[in-house]
Curated annotation (Swiss-Prot):
Protein name per the record: Large ribosomal subunit protein bL31
Similarity annotation: Belongs to the bacterial ribosomal protein bL31 family. Type A subfamily.
GO cellular component terms attached to this protein's record: ribonucleoprotein complex; ribosome
Domain of life from the UniProt record: Bacteria
PANTHER family linked to this entry: 50S RIBOSOMAL PROTEIN L31, CHLOROPLASTIC, LARGE RIBOSOMAL SUBUNIT PROTEIN BL31A
Keyword tags: Ribonucleoprotein, Ribosomal protein, RNA-binding, rRNA-binding
Pfam families: Ribosomal_L31
Biological role stated in the UniProt entry: Binds the 23S rRNA.
Amino acid sequence: MKKGIHPNYVPCKVTCVTSGKEFEVLSTKPELRIDISSFCHPFYTGSDKVVDTAGRVEKFKQKYNMK
């Protein structure tokens, strides 16, 4: 690796806005705020959230009188 061209890595405090949990990683920035993390994402927590896409399709069909 060339010297003097790579950014410096510092300990970074990452805060999940949704769950309020904090953890530390290495990054080029000292602090990050994220919307979702492994503490609150349904894939990692095991909780299922159903997204109602059928409702949106039905609204579209009603709006344009489609069957």
